[in-house]
Amino acid sequence: MAELNLKGNRRVLTGVVVSDKADKTIVVRCETLVKHSLYKKYIRRHTKFMAHDPSNECGIGDKVQIVEFRPLSRRKRWHLDKILEKAV
């Protein structure tokens, strides 16, 4: 699930790394639960964020925490905060 916290004025998200092919960039998939307005059933929604990984330490499947940052490129506005769990 995507946990949304505020770190000062910056948003903090938790997700899973789905790609680490680009240099110093990871793609993080963040899932969230949304309640359907008519059927009252919870539905999983996901969003992908590109995040800056300065030391290329993340791998596919790692659970990470990312924090909102200044724009680094057209799609990169997030920065790797910490690795919560390494993939096996």
Swiss-Prot record:
InterPro entries: NA-bd_OB-fold, Ribosomal_uS17, Ribosomal_uS17_bact/chlr, Ribosomal_uS17_CS. GO terms for cellular component: cytosolic small ribosomal subunit. It comes from the Bacteria. PROSITE patterns: RIBOSOMAL_S17. Keywords: Ribonucleoprotein, Ribosomal protein, RNA-binding, rRNA-binding. GO terms for molecular function: rRNA binding; structural constituent of ribosome. SUPFAM superfamilies: Nucleic acid-binding proteins. GO terms for biological process: translation. Pfam families: Ribosomal_S17. PANTHER family: 40S RIBOSOMAL PROTEIN S11 FAMILY MEMBER, SMALL RIBOSOMAL SUBUNIT PROTEIN US17M. Part of the 30S ribosomal subunit. Belongs to the universal ribosomal protein uS17 family. One of the primary rRNA binding proteins, it binds specifically to the 5'-end of 16S ribosomal RNA. This is Small ribosomal subunit protein uS17. It comes from Maridesulfovibrio salexigens (strain ATCC 14822 / DSM 2638 / NCIMB 8403 / VKM B-1763) (Desulfovibrio salexigens). The gene is rpsQ.
